[in-house]
């Protein structure tokens, strides 16, 4: 690899949790706070600088300026605000409750198929949990039960959302509060391909002839668990991200014998559709092609109606009840698409469920 190592950043979810933690701290202690520390989903402790701090006896507010590191993220520099309000809960046996809602610049879900129900603010489950836990932790030492309401807002979120695919997905009025790890990894193409080359070289040098190419950290963890009994070496796991075509060709060029493609349904469907680059800026998922495949496959014909009204690939999979015919159809086509990109490689495909289980491997 050449050049400096790219700097990682933090997700909107991590920033929202930090802002909520800071506001909760000021509200409870009735004093200004300059920073707030939160625990990310994988256990890392990170401190965020706070801005715009205000508090009274009943509410407090502040914001965190999102730093996406060297990732070309449209939300880089955005102000992620959180306001925490409290009211006493005068009921015998009551416990403190935390409610999280979206304010100005946070979108609302209007179509099914996403991780958040229709009508709810576009705050994904992991950030929602991070925000709730951060506020609960601050008030855990308070004996008097209270109702704590957290409002997350992004002042220019509606304008920024126009630069994303949110509207197409049915997220209206603003941005989504996202993140599963709290950390944004840079997606610079040169950085990724340099990293891929180095990782593949290391794996082969360690004697690995089967390499696991994952689209993200979640699918990587799933495949590591699934293949734990096969003495899978850590070096064999290569996070290819969205660079499917490059990773497969590099494996073949460098002498690997087999590759296991590991990803969730939407990513594998993109691979099946022939996309060598699966990032949203480079590839659009057209469910009409999936509908054509289903129509041409007798074993999957019962799934046709599910695709007609679907908004996302995830919605199709979940509505099918993880139907084996659907998974076989998409995974087999992903496998064939991968073979076209790297004919010398033996290819297997692992479909990681949205609940981190193995849905298909073959």
UniProtKB/Swiss-Prot annotation:
<keyword id="KW-0489">Methyltransferase</keyword>
<dbReference type="InterPro" id="IPR002748">
    <property type="entry name" value="CbiD"/>
</dbReference>
<dbReference type="GO" id="GO:0043780">
    <property type="term" value="F:cobalt-precorrin-5B C1-methyltransferase activity"/>
</dbReference>
<keyword id="KW-0808">Transferase</keyword>
<comment type="pathway">
    <text>Cofactor biosynthesis; adenosylcobalamin biosynthesis; cob(II)yrinate a,c-diamide from sirohydrochlorin (anaerobic route): step 6/10.</text>
</comment>
<dbReference type="Pfam" id="PF01888">
    <property type="entry name" value="CbiD"/>
</dbReference>
<dbReference type="GO" id="GO:0019251">
    <property type="term" value="P:anaerobic cobalamin biosynthetic process"/>
</dbReference>
<keyword id="KW-0169">Cobalamin biosynthesis</keyword>
<keyword id="KW-0949">S-adenosyl-L-methionine</keyword>
<dbReference type="InterPro" id="IPR036074">
    <property type="entry name" value="CbiD_sf"/>
</dbReference>
<dbReference type="GO" id="GO:0032259">
    <property type="term" value="P:methylation"/>
</dbReference>
<protein>
    <recommendedName>
        <fullName>Cobalt-precorrin-5B C(1)-methyltransferase</fullName>
        <ecNumber>2.1.1.195</ecNumber>
    </recommendedName>
</protein>
<comment type="similarity">
    <text>Belongs to the CbiD family.</text>
</comment>
